[in-house]
Amino acid sequence: MPSLRIEPGKLSGRIFIQPSKSMAHRLVLCALLAEGASEIDNIVLSDDIKATLGACESLGASVRIEDSTVFSGRKRVIITSKGQIRVVKPVIDCFESGTTARFIIPVSRLCADPVTLTGRGRLVTRPFDIYKSLLPGKGVNYTDEGGKMPIGLEGRLMPGDYDIRGDVSSQFISGLLMALPFLDEDSRIRITGPLESRPYVKMTIDTLKRFGITIEHSEDCSMFRISGRQKAAACSLAVEGDWSQAAFFCVLGAISGEVSIDGLNRDSLQGDRIILDIVRSMGARTVWNNGTLEISPGTLNSICVDASQCPDLVPAVAVAAALCPGESVIKNAQRLRLKESDRLSAVCSELNKLGARVEENRDGLVIHGVEHFTGAGVDGWNDHRIVMALAIASSRSTGPVEISGFEAVSKSYPEFWQDFRLLGGRIYEQHMG
């Protein structure tokens, strides 16, 4: 298996962050549901986005990909749809994209025709129990292989009341919010318990609004009222920069050298924008300069982070916390055990190989700061965020960090190693016998 050796050293410089994967998924799905031709600019063809584009084609849309004339090195995608779901390819490969699967399951049920969803890697065993329990009572025949993919679906989704726990992936709620407005009657979604990852649900509602779809909800997002018989209109939009991916470079700026990031929306609805508050609370200096975010190191101090609203930030934040004097705590992150890897175990295992002092508990991590990391061979766990976190850690290592499974970044951020090099990263691919 090939691995990547990263030589230690201070990193600094300027990058143009890649577009938001979360927003791109939502724009692409809304374009499928809208009548006419929608143009979505500033797209990077990560594996996850390829999966969602392929699903749109399977459900009746045509997809054309061109080079962007506005965003250098990026793509513009033109999605033409009749605004109605029709199954033209009965098997949809979701790759390893949980977002694709959780959005497509309810959206595909806007028609009665049978469809089968397949996946790869860990996605095959990731839980879809929420839909498995909800949909059979709403007109959908749902089958799987002992709780695993492939998932078979047949029948048209019915309007009505949907009750969902707030501590599950918000993608289940977003998927229903995308489908229910197109049914013949009104629906409601009731959330039991506090809604985690609330910003992602608000992003879904905002994206639907751009296509002419309205969703009413209570202030605490415990109740959503969805009028039926709505129609989505095609439109042209550009994807804003990705705060989830920028988080790794915000941490890099906090622990290594000054990093400048272009392409971010300061007022974004993306929940992971909270990374700025987190690195500032750790002692980093941040400033906006003519639309560019600049992060530089300060005197680091330990923190306590509630990850219930920003679970994707945990791998990056853990790297910074491992270098903060004293004890840091990351809590309410139990859903990370069901991601592309068990991220709590992965972070604990791999950072400890680099000399960190990380303890894992049921829903989080307790981290005792060290002065620096040590060189070692580490495993990326076939998880893009684990690989990127380990790469950032190398900037404060006393020896080379060698990552196996480094290719996992293609899932969400195929430009990552290019941007890492722009900041001075010295990387060398190794081939094992």
PLM region spans:
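Short, structured segments at the rim of ligand-binding sites
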Residues: M1-G433
